[in-house]
Amino acid sequence: MRRHSTFRTGNPALSSETFKNASRTTNEKMTLEGTINKSGISLLILMMTAFYTFTTENVNFISIGLIGGFILALITIFKKEWAPYTTPFYAALEGLALGGISIVFNSMYPGIAQQAVFLTFGIFGALLFAYKSQMIKATENFKLGLVAATGGIMIAYIINLIVSWWSGSNLYFMTLGQPGAPAPMISVGFSIFVVIIASLNLVLDFDFIEQGCEIGAPK
């Protein structure tokens, strides 16, 4: 059995009380295969609604998706036994929001939406493979480093927000550049770093889910 990190994921739906509370409502046991299958179905639903929104070019779905998704997320966090029913609807609403946001960004930076889709699938698949093959392990040091990097990024964005309020411009390494013009290489490098750190947070979720399967947590 693999040794798991004692640090927990920052996902509020995967807190330390998740399995404890769920055990009161069901005797069915979760499996890694079942979790992956349901995650795949949810991702498929998300992609379908996102594709619909993107092809119809209806940005009004952004507010519907964000508000509806936020409400369902809160319901799922506090009523975890409802997760099998709320998850598909949450995925559909998030797809509406992401599709609308993709329309906005694709109008400013043509082709960026398609790149984001391929990167999302690629990163998720690569990280899942790396975790299962133990190329990446959710150790204590890994968690500490990830928390430090994530916190540093958050502080950088807060500073950038304050600077933009006062000066009307962004920090140089966060400059996107004008539409149609290339962004500074340091900005591109910082963006890649942020994507990598954000993606590595998925490893903590993988570790938490696998631990639940190993201890026979409820479905």
Predicted regions: what they are:
Residues 1-219:
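A hydrophobic alpha-helical transmembrane-helix feature that marks the membrane cores
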